[in-house]
């Protein structure tokens, strides 16, 4: 009887510890090819581009990345990976080409938007809008 109680309590303790394990697993860095990193954004960041980028971001990105790009959208908590925070230096220090590549190609929970948004200029407009966070 005492052995069964000890096993039961050990099991409960182990389950309780799971509550402290972070949901989002650490991610390996994106492997962005040099050619993609060095690609220049052909879409000027002007009012028209930003309006287009915002509309597309709201349609395709906001549910995970959040209204202000902090990675806190309503779907973010259901993902196995971290959405990232577009307001932090780690994001802001990336090239436009890197952001375009990541948005286009995706990985794991991040969809490859080149399939959903086939016009590359629209993805560049999203990059321009992401730069406003």
Identify the role of each PLM range:
Residues 51-58, 93-97, 107, 118:
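Sequence context surrounding c-type heme c attachment/ligation sites in exported
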Residues 50-52, 70-96:
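Gly/Gly-Pro-rich "capping" loops immediately C-terminal to redox-active cysteine motifs
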Residues 21-25, 81-84, 102-133:
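Axial heme c-ligation environment in periplasmic c-type cytochrome domains
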Residues 34-40, 78-85, 107:
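Short glycine/proline- and charge-enriched loop/turn segments
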Residues 26-56:
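Electrostatic cytochrome c docking/interface patches
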Residues 1-4:
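Positively charged n-region of N-terminal signal peptides that target proteins for export
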Residues 47-70, 76, 104-105:
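Sequence/structural segment immediately N-terminal to covalent heme-attachment motifs in c-type
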Residues 10-16:
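Bacterial N-terminal signal peptides
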